[in-house]
Amino acid sequence: MKIAIIGSGIAGLTSAYLLNRQHDITLFEAADWVGGHTHTVDVTVAGQHYAIDTGFIVFNDWTYPNFIRLMQRLGVASKPTEMSFSVTDPDSGTEYNGNTLNSLFAQRSNLLSPRFWGMIRDILRFNKAVQKDLADGQIGAAVTLGEYLREQGYGQRFIDHYIVPMGAAIWSMPLADMLNFPLQFFVRFFRNHGLLSVTERPQWHVIMGGSSAYVAPLTASFAERIRLNCPVQRVDRHSDGVTIVSAAGSERFDQVIFACHSDQ
């Protein structure tokens, strides 16, 4: 078949990689580079080279089984890394890191702080209660994180110094917007990534040489089928296929794969 693929993120590139073996594929990319959220900046400091990932950074052995198999097939190496959460609030003077007990109480004054211990109690309560409430159908689709926290009486220290900054860091959102986040999605994401447990956590990994290191081997077999700077303007469906209207003109295909964000 003649297949059009729109978007060159991991979904589009993997689709092209697999389908190119038996089909005539064309990959359309609006930007002048491929890789989607994958973006590595190479930096040299004092003669030492660093590959800094500013987009896709890490993956884990719980939720990325297909990606791991793909990297193994491509021969792309990875290595284990740590994922920890730290908070520093100059206004309140609060500072901690959740990686170990020692780093949790890096500020020894927190050992005697009722508010800090209250935050820890709220963390344990939230981790248990929110999973039960979701399983019992007590969390409606329209319920936000902020509504739930207010209704259940969670402390301000837990809100300001744990759950809101953690969510904002994960989704790159302003702190003020995090309380309006849909709670159902929030809980499912946290549960799937081991963030609602203090003991059972997945092993995280990084691509050696930076995340962009997988792009070249992934695209090697169909590099000539990639069209950069070629945004798709319209897709018309027919009984026997589709018409793709892009910067390159109008073309017919048997199938189309939308490997892009829904608002694109």
Where are these regions (language model features)?
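Conserved Rossmann-like nucleotide-cofactor binding loop
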Residues: 11, 33, 263
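Short hydrophobic core segments
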Residues: 6, 232, 251-263
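N-terminal Rossmann-like FAD-binding beta1-loop-alpha1 element of flavoenzymes
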Residues: 2-27
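Mobile amphipathic helical/loop "lid" adjacent to a hydrophobic cofactor/ligand pocket
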Residues: 61, 65-183, 187-188
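Glycine-rich FAD pyrophosphate-binding loop
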Residues: 20-44
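General small-molecule cofactor/ligand-binding pocket signal
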Residues: 26, 51, 79, 225-229
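N-terminal glycine-rich dinucleotide-binding loop that anchors FAD/FMN and/or NAD(P) in oxidoreductases
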Residues: 41-67
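Helical element adjacent to the flavin cofactor pocket in flavoenzyme catalytic cores
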Residues: 188-246
